[in-house]
Design a protein with these regions (language model features):
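Conserved, mostly hydrophobic/aromatic
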Residues: 59, 118, 193
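Substrate-binding cleft of extracellular glycoside hydrolase catalytic domains
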Residues: 68-175
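Active-site mouth loops of central-metabolism enzymes
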Residues: 28-42, 91-92, 172-173
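Noncatalytic carbohydrate-binding groove/subsite architecture in carbohydrate-active enzymes
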Residues: 130-230
């Protein structure tokens, strides 16, 4: 029990801070990315119980984890489940592999687990060898979900640095040959593009245009000079 206490305390602190953020204007719900790499971590069930006790309505897992998925059954927590980068090639190359992945990691737990999105790859850079597998893997996973009778959206998670220029409303994707076909797929299927946004890093890299209150989530709103909208 003593080995789990520091990690459990850290999770409780994070949960408490995020719960406080729910009081910010315009915030309807909030989720927490659940990383499983580390020492002396609480059990999966303890982590899910913490989410529920702090009214955290969303979770992201960076790869399938049987214990975590089992603990999520009946929790009503919406889940974003990632497909790791090292699995993209096999899933992109073989529709049967995609179908088996969906069977093992999604259909087995649905509808007891509320899958919101399957994120095919996380922060895959356009220059990486894995980049050419992202879209075909997304297509195969989408087809496997449809064949399994599951209405779950498929997307991928990108770095905010994939967009160049400031403000974001005036930005452009820096590798249109990579992202444009993905955007077309997402638009055709009514899926969002997922982006990993780190406000404090944005502030650190561009303090002239980005305010500290924005980075600390204490700003009542941030207006884009391009759109005059928050």
């Amino acid at each position: 029990m003593s080995l789990k206490q520091p990690a459990m305390s850290s999770l409780f602190l994070v949960g408490s801070l995020l719960l406080a953020m729910l009081q910010l204007p315009g915030v309807q719900s909030i989720g927490v990315c659940y990383g499983l790499l580390g020492d002396n971590l609480p059990s999966r069930q303890d982590a899910v119980n913490l989410y529920k006790s702090r009214n955290l309505g969303g979770m992201r897992l960076y790869s399938p984890d049987r214990e975590a998925l089992q603990a999520l059954r009946g929790s009503n927590i919406e889940l974003i489940l990632d497909i790791p980068k090292d699995q993209l090639e096999s899933i992109a190359s073989n529709a049967g592999t995609a179908s088996q992945w969906v069977q093992d990691n999604v259909k087995t737990y649905s509808p007891d687990v509320r899958f919101k999105y399957i994120a095919v790859g996380n922060e895959v850079e356009p220059e990486e060898a894995a980049a050419r597998f992202v879209l075909p893997a997304m297509q195969n996973i989408h087809n496997a979900l449809v064949s399994a009778g599951l209405q779950i959206k498929v997307s991928t998670a990108v770095k905010s640095s994939l967009v160049t220029g400031y403000p974001p409303a005036n930005g452009q994707f820096r590798s249109s040959s990579y992202i444009d076909p993905i955007i077309n797929f997402l638009a055709a299927n009514g899926s969002p593009l997922l982006a990993n946004i780190y406000p404090y890093i944005s502030y650190f890299e561009n303090p002239r245009d980005i305010s500290l209150p924005y980075a600390l989530f204490t700003s009542p709103g941030t207006l884009s000079p391009m759109t005059s909208a928050a």
